């Protein structure tokens, strides 16, 4: 079964980006056609991505891969959700305008820090941590642990704006920002999460489906723990696609990885 077989059954679609539409280098076969079919049916697709970057930066990347902006109604990134949460005061005074925050991410990556109302500083003088990306494999989890021990001892709050545990890279699967956040928790640090499977990003995505019952929205992703679990908690119908992080994994393994079983298992889009 593929996503295109289910378009007539639902009123809206929430679709993951990495591992579902593309692999970071090229769009998957059938991905563009599926978005075109949703649009032709007069229905809306919202792309929901655990990415510390802005929605605009993700849209630009998709365009470079041939996925045109007109093919989806909106894109919501976890980084964008974090910014909106800061504006609403959701994360407390440490992330209020002007807060001294140390940013964790990939070396040389542009996370558009000017969109956050914060003051980026060195780790030693930070009042909070903002985890936007991972520098793995250049920096190992053991090295992150050593770096973050003093921050945990100081009881600094960390905001993880990408809860993914694994990421697809040219060198294979590597620890993602969520894995760094877990390391910080094991050190005794406190972490707030924004992104799938947590509620805020789904609340933002739901704004594009005013008047649509949650069960009439099909959420499609490749991560049992993030895409399926988060969408199920939001009340959406769920579909796990066997690409990306789920490629090559048998059904029993996928079931063990998911607190909530998906409503549908898809071979592709």
Please report, for each region that a protein language model flagged, where it lies by residue.
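Asp-based, Mg2+/Mn2+-dependent phosphohydrolase catalytic module
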Residues: 1-17, 22-41, 51-269
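Glycine-rich loop-to-alpha-helix module at the N-terminal edge of alpha/beta enzyme cores
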Residues: 48
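N-terminal phosphate-binding loop and flanking beta/alpha elements of the actin-like ATPase fold
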Residues: 44
